[in-house]
Amino acid sequence: IYVYTGLIKYLDDASSLAGVVGHEMAHADKRHSTRQMTEVYGIQTLLSFIGGNAQQIAEIAGQLISLKFSRNHETEADTYSVKYLCPTRYRADGAADFFKKIGSQGTPEFLSTHPDPGNRVANITKQKNDLNCNDTDNYTQGEDITSYDQLKVALQ
């Protein structure tokens, strides 16, 4: 998992960063890339039997189905980010901060590889509430807030 300086500068606090990292950890833990390649390969193999002029239709259908798999993986990664962070000192809904910031990009959800940001915030918040996770950082009085701000300044 790589964290780029632009992400650190973009986010407001360590819980937001922990939420994004937790989301990416879930992709690796749940083997989303491997699962998606297997699912798409199976569908493409099945659709290739159609043959003839229908080959283009089969390719387009395969791509649209792939988008749905990707959205499901994104939702699962959001859920596991909350589960991973719930027992920690970070807010379990830290990833929601990122989605609040980016807002809607205007792409219709059915053509996107990622679910709508507003839906993601709602799902993350629901998951946090269902698991009775903390609503606040457990280090707000500590040095980590200052350290995160100092890190952002150092990256300028």
Predicted regions and their residues:
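A Zn2+-metalloprotease active-site environment signal
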Residues: I1-Q156
